[in-house]
């Protein structure tokens, strides 16, 4: 911003802001006596970054075991009925599925960043899968 020359102005006399400050102070003190304290909220993105760091450090499975098991059995029903699974087989399926999804989301994030965005969209997932050669 360019510097501008300041000109003298005629004063109006009394100082009005003092009254305003007094009313501000009265407003501040009034809610503290009878009002309910507002819950603390983090700024947008702070919790997301904390979760990213937390999950990048961890090695545990992110999808709950029983819902994944039900889904795997439901999908297997379409191919052959009355299939039985060892618990190790379900565990291996879940490990592989989560590894695939995490990798896909990493590539999806790179696609979003390439488009100068921070929000991933379905078109980013489609592009990532197309580049990988999974979907023509």
From Swiss-Prot:
The nucleosome is a histone octamer containing two molecules each of H2A, H2B, H3 and H4 assembled in one H3-H4 heterotetramer and two H2A-H2B heterodimers. The octamer wraps approximately 147 bp of DNA. Interacts with HIRA, a chaperone required for its incorporation into nucleosomes. Interacts with ZMYND11; when trimethylated at 'Lys-36' (H3.3K36me3). Found in a co-chaperone complex with DNJC9, MCM2 and histone H3.3-H4 dimers. Within the complex, interacts with DNJC9 (via C-terminus); the interaction is direct. Interacts with ASF1A, MCM2, NASP and SPT2. The modification Asymmetric dimethylarginine is found at residues 3, 18. The record marks 32 as: Interaction with ZMYND11. The modification N6-methyllysine is found at residues 5, 10, 19, 24, 28, 37-38, 57, 65, 80, 123. PANTHER family: HISTONE H3. This is Histone H3.3. Residues 1-43 are annotated as: Disordered. GO terms for cellular component: nucleosome; nucleus. GO terms for molecular function: DNA binding; protein heterodimerization activity; structural constituent of chromatin. The modification 5-glutamyl serotonin is found at residue 6. The modification Symmetric dimethylarginine is found at residue 9. Its main location: nucleus. Pfam families: Histone (PF00125). The modification N6-lactoyllysine is found at residues 10, 15, 19, 24, 28, 57, 80. Acetylation is generally linked to gene activation. Acetylation on Lys-10 (H3K9ac) impairs methylation at Arg-9 (H3R8me2s). Acetylation on Lys-19 (H3K18ac) and Lys-24 (H3K24ac) favors methylation at Arg-18 (H3R17me). Acetylation at Lys-123 (H3K122ac) by EP300/p300 plays a central role in chromatin structure: localizes at the surface of the histone octamer and stimulates transcription, possibly by promoting nucleosome instability. Citrullination at Arg-9 (H3R8ci) and/or Arg-18 (H3R17ci) by PADI4 impairs methylation and represses transcription. The modification ADP-ribosylserine is found at residues 11, 29.
